[in-house]
Design a protein with these regions (language model features):
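Active-site-proximal segments of metal-dependent phosphoesterases and phosphodiesterases across multiple
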Residues: 8, 79-88, 93-127
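Active-site-proximal beta-strand elements of phosphoester/diester hydrolases
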Residues: 69-78, 97-101, 145-148
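Residues at the starts of beta-strands that form the adenosine-phosphate
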Residues: 25, 71, 95, 128, ...
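Active-site environment of divalent metal-dependent phosphoester hydrolases
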Residues: 2, 27-39, 65-66, 79-82, ...
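Core catalytic region of metal-dependent phosphoesterases/phosphodiesterases
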Residues: 1-64, 123-127
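Divalent metal-coordination and catalytic microenvironments
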Residues: 11, 31, 72, 101, ...
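Short, glycine/charged-enriched secondary-structure capping and boundary segments
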Residues: 5-8, 41-45, 87-89, 111-115, ...
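Conserved beta-sheet core of the metallophosphoesterase superfamily
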Residues: 110-170
């Protein structure tokens, strides 16, 4: 795994530096591409590259947070090291909403391919809404929403709807 230094410089100049100057708090979770090892989130790119920003909060373990008046369970990439802890956090959470980097079976990864393995969505039945990254294509089942990536990365991303999402904590 590697970091494109030009992209990192662009992201810092045009995203992280600007949001820091504006006083915006950023919450980010570790995903499978930012974790260096397959079985742990401990060594990860977002922690190592963004720790200089006091406004950036990085989550490598499932954590309940509160934004405005909404409790949200943040769930980073689930691996062999954090699986039991994550399941316990899901069970104990009083949040209505989950935001994570989750690999559910039965959802479109990209056009023409549906994931036939992964976590069963029933594990998240107690939550009103689940928002996730990981799959590049937007899809949902009415409760679980894969947000897709904001721009085309691969040829199979071509012509899919892209962009950013704004989350309203009040409605």
């Amino acid at each position: 795994k590697g970091v494109d230094f030009s992209s990192l410089a662009w992201a810092k100049d045009n995203y992280y530096d600007r949001l820091e100057k504006m006083g915006c708090e950023i919450h980010t979770i570790v995903g499978n591409h930012t974790a260096y090892y397959k079985n742990t989130n401990d060594v990860n790119a977002v922690d190592l590259l963004l720790r200089e920003y006091e406004n950036v909060k990085i989550y490598s373990e499932a954590t309940d947070i509160k934004i405005d008046n909404l409790n949200i369970l943040l769930v980073p990439w689930i691996n062999s090291e954090n699986e039991k802890m994550t399941l316990d956090a899901i069970d104990k959470s009083k949040s209505r909403c989950v935001m994570g980097h989750l690999e559910f079976k039965g959802f479109r990864i990209h056009r023409g391919f549906v994931m036939d393995q992964g976590t069963d969505v029933k594990l998240f039945d107690k939550f009103d809404r689940v928002y996730s990254g990981h799959y590049h294509t937007r899809s949902d089942d009415g409760k679980v929403f894969y947000l897709g990536n904001p721009y085309e990365m691969y040829w199979n991303d071509l012509s899919d709807t892209r962009g950013f999402h704004i989350f309203d904590t009040e409605t």
